[in-house]
Amino acid sequence: MAVKYVPYFKDAIQGQALLDNFVRTKRILKYADNNEIKERIERGLPLYETEVTEIVGKESDNLIIRGECVSACAYLKENNIKVDLVYIDPPFASGADYAKTVYIRRNPKIAEAIKKAEEKFEIEELKSFEEKMYGDIWNKEAYLNWMYENLMAIKSVMSETASIYIHLDWHICHYVKILMDEIFGEDNFLNEIIWSYSWGSRIETQWNKKHDTLYMYSKSEKFYFDAKEVLEERKISESTKNRLKYKGAMITDRNKGRGDQEKALPTDVWYIATINGMATEKVDYSTQKPEALLERIIKASSDSNMIIADFFGGSGVTAKVANDLGRKFIHCDIGINSIETTRDRLKRAGASFKVMDIKDGVNLYRNPVQTMDKIKSLISGLKNEDSVSEFWEGAVNDSKLGLVPVYVPNLMDSTTKLLDIVLINKVINLAIPELPDEIKKVIIYYIDIIDKKEINDFIKENLGREIEIELRDLKEILSETVIDDILEYHILDNEIIIDSFISERIIKKINEYNEKMKAQFIVKGGKIKCIEISEEGLELIEMISLDCTSDKGIWHSDEEIKIDKLGYITENGVKTKNFWNGKIKFVKKPLRIKIRNISGDESIHIIEI
């Protein structure tokens, strides 16, 4: 449950004006749930307890936060932390599911044999399966409600000289532009930037879509911008140079040896290549953006030591570039894959930072979309039911009461996390009246609740038909989903030797994949490409970390190896051409060992010597 609610606005009058603007925006866009989002914003930002889980490098103000945008902003606001530049790359409402390719690592014994034979494995030979990261499937109303609440939260933690870049594409950008005008003010709209690239669709029936859109807004008229940091080099002829000289946008570079190179003020159309498969910056994250894109934004719109924030951090490109350019950073994301990818990326870059977890009551199973899938399998008897609306996750059959509709909050939509008067009113006055008359009971799962007695009193006073509403805590189900991986090891001299590693969750996933492959073989024929895991299971390990500082509390990675998909290791942030040999060395006595499996689950074990 939230510790308290932090007001979005210092001045209630200003806050009400913004909300009144939102009412007008809703009327223009003609979509629903106006009162719902208005009441949530009037209530304030939900502030939860936080836990620092790891410190990397020296003591630093840099943060990696696992949690939702709104909850992260509540933490920043409560601690008087203001950000000077925001870049966000939120879901585009594209209707697509995004997946992570999970590669089975090489068994150390096999990898060593390959090394001795001086052979190389091609990437195509690697065995892998996919896991969902998140679903970008929204209806327009839900997306805009969610986006409005996030943008209001972000604005509340921006400094007076801050600006924000929001990265979108053709699916929803025209609607979000109207929200941005209302939240930040039409007068604070600065640019519509076109990022043009060659990657993408190849069709002949219409113009090919080859760009994304970035909207730039400022918090006030006193925003920071330095065009000299991002001047563009262009070649021009001597005759043109003499004719233009200091006129227009051209700025002559007087340094010797430049030849016909000139520098020009940047425009709002950017030709920046997407990341190719062999790029050194590539981190195998499906929505990764190029560092060159963020470099241009951060150089122009911030100065050294300013705080750069990305509340949908993804691959960690914003934090990485901010650190490279001498800025402070805040990276926030709800998915464990984002947190781990960014953490590893920044460690390789030599950055110092804290990793924090927002304790919002949800013990996520890797990420929201996988948690939703897991929940459906854990609610006994839950199945899809055509006779109930999509508000309900489905229904269960009760031997006495018959069909019982079940509501489950959508973990990908933060507005459904809290069971409050707004949500239960929606259940009573919108969802229940649409149910068939023979329905006698509904089940409402919740993650967080304002006050159970208050909710039950509201139900008694407002429920207009004879139907039972049962409230259930979703956390009781989620607590059953986490099963620690099993590790066996022994210590010899200054090395820990991994004997075996068992991850029931991954084994189950691999078995599901193999069954799918067998089914395809029956239908299509051909060779069955099943995944087999050795008895030791070492190929299921992605990273090993030793804490030689403390046996509890905040993690300190004193020794660390990460195994890439080809079997090579990165040792304490430094890439090598060595295969993993099934061991990890230490200098100081290790107190704890952390193992990350190839799907991103981490388990910590106390070392007994």
Where are the regions that the model predicts?
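Accessory, often C-terminal, charged low-complexity segments
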Residues: 1-56, 61, 70, 77, ...
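Conserved helix-to-beta-strand junction in the class I
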Residues: 156-158, 167, 183, 301
